[in-house]
Amino acid sequence: MPALAVDAAAPVAHAFACDAARFPAPLLGPAAAAAAVAEKPDAAAWSADLSSALYNVDGWGAPYFFVNDDGDVAVRPHGAATLPGQEIDLAKVVAKAAGPRSGGGLGLPLPLLVRFPDVLRHRVEALNAAFDYAVRSTGYGGRYQGVYPVKCNQDRHVVEDIVEFGEPFRFGLEAGSKPELLLAMSCLAARGNPDALLICNGYKDDEYVSLALIARTMGLNTVIVLEQEEELDIVVDASRRLGVRPVVGMRAKLRTKHAGHFGSTSGEKGKFGLNAAQILSVVAKLKTLGMLDCLQLLHFHIGSQIPTTALLGDGVGEAAQIYCELARLGAAMRVIDVGGGLGIDYDGSHSAQTDMSVAYSLEEYAAAVVAAVGRVCDRKGVAHPIICSESGRALVSHHSVLVFEAFSASAPGRIDPATGYLLDELTDDCHADYRNLMAAAVRGDFDTCALYADQLKRRCADQFKDGVLGLEHLAAVDSLCEIVARGMGAAEPPRTYHINLSVFTSLPDMWAIGQMFPIIPIQRLGERPAVDGVLSDLTCDSDGKVDHFIGGRHSLPLHELPVHGTRGYYLGMFLGGAYQEALGGLHNLFGGPSVVRVSQSDGPHCFAVTRAAAGPSCADVLRSMQHEPEVMFEVLKQRTDGATAAALARAFGAMPYLSFDPEAAAMASGESSGMSSDSEGSAAGAAEEDDDEWEFMRGLTV
């Protein structure tokens, strides 16, 4: 587009101020002015309740998370039954965990994973209560007896807690691999209910099947679920060799299909399960072997995050029909395992429109399952079976919160008055575009402004590539166009907040499958969040960002960062207790977070930290990739003096994430080592510290 003649006087470049406040504003009508005021209310009029509504905390967080009167995110560890004196302020937990030891804190580096075992207990109790109510209210003749699929979160304390909390309900475990089976066997043997089910899923070899049969000899209620027809031969051979009669289940491949991205394992082309012909073949083989009484369980799975009870009812009804057919064929059927699929509401919409939510409650899910099984069994005249579910996501998602710090943010565009003259040095065609842009701005002509801003930027970029303009000219033009856009009322582009976190390690589902989790500030919620931001992690990867948020947002309302040296700006990622820890990788060798276990107590802050552990150190993550930190340290130490070697030892022992603790930074640089800068002092220090340098590093590793 050629430069147009200037039809209004425009000021010279350096007459403009550094921000949009000094830009000539367009005239606004009363309606537009009212809308602008509504969009940017006075910060004093803001409240914690408004923040709660803005982030829809009650939608996705109830009954566990809410915004308290102090403007902090708080936790109700016992759900709706939590008393006012039992609520836990998450910001106070972070202050305790990350605060310096000299001030009574634990000195743990961030990021920080906060576990709430009381929430886990409440989830176990709520799931069992929902099914118990559905059974009693409908006169169902069986009972509910669930299992926790350990793949959702294999952390020792999580699994042990679930078994302990579930013991009164005969709650068991599900394993899908040999290490998971060993984990489940030891945990159930130590603290489980003798009647608790141990469901063995996944592909199997002789060693896997032998472990499962050994578990039966230990008195564990073990069921080997056939995923493939040929697994039956392995089970029969192992049982004969060990002299153990197995209890067998089958996974059916249903026709019912779940269309969401969590439903790829459902339908006739699903990854797992036996079709109708294969089911009949297994029954025939068992009958020939005189082992048909060993077949006692039917399992199916139509996908995680089942969106509606209508789809759930279809799948359960189809499976119940197969269950009844197996009973008719002579199998000693007693359990129907409905698999996973009990979803949670990540975005708080309570709808089936996206994969981020479900259109039912826990109670409605249980009622739909019980009704579907009971209806089919009644029609077929088959005794009501034990109902089992593998509801991992619904159990563990709420129990942990990932807390991380935003340590810097990109600055909005500005023009330095000292460099504003650069705009007057543009070439003639660029300068004509510039003056036309200014004239349109004075008139309040938004469309023409946008046109000339785009043309000016493109023309200047071309001339920069040709070497006509310098980098300073390019920066001045970019800043000017950004300020003009803001002055014309255009939405300010989101600012990038840099976070002390690895998305690949702590939020793997977010970049891998587009899963969204609620992310909000955990404090300052009594203040209006005046900045729209996106999050960028520490990794050297363009995928290491968060720019999609619940509610369809492409930015997150945030606050201006605190002045350097004051308290940090902490964000929390919620509902991530399932899968994220197991799936996280070591991109750029960033390891996992520090972890604290927090229980409700009668203390002054209503909580007690019952377990704390710093995250993996640099040495730990290097070792996981087959490096030898001890050897690396010795090689490096040969080229350093004593003070530097001590700093190296501390670096090996520290977490890979950034540290903003001045004392820690001084220690790492050797400023607090007490070492002299002269060579004699350094040599003496090296001699004194030679024996304890590596021990100091080893003590810092987890």
Curated annotation (Swiss-Prot):
Expressed in roots, leaves and stems (at protein level). Residues 668-686 have a biased composition (Low complexity). Substrate binds at residues 336-346. Induction: By cold stress. Its EC number is 4.1.1.19. CDD domains: PLPDE_III_ADC. Pfam families: Orn_Arg_deC_N. GO terms for biological process: arginine catabolic process; putrescine biosynthetic process; response to cold; spermidine biosynthetic process. SUPFAM superfamilies: Alanine racemase C-terminal domain-like (SSF50621), PLP-binding barrel (SSF51419). It comes from the Eukaryota. This is Arginine decarboxylase 1. The modification N6-(pyridoxal phosphate)lysine is found at residue 151. It catalyses: L-arginine + H(+) = agmatine + CO2. It is an enzyme of class 4 (lyase). Its cofactor is pyridoxal 5'-phosphate; Mg(2+). NCBIfam families: PRK05354.1, speA. The keyword Magnesium applies. Keywords: Decarboxylase, Lyase, Magnesium, Putrescine biosynthesis, Pyridoxal phosphate, Spermidine biosynthesis. GO terms for molecular function: arginine decarboxylase activity. Residues 668-702 are annotated as: Disordered. The gene is ADC1. Pathway: Amine and polyamine biosynthesis; agmatine biosynthesis; agmatine from L-arginine: step 1/1. Belongs to the Orn/Lys/Arg decarboxylase class-II family. SpeA subfamily.
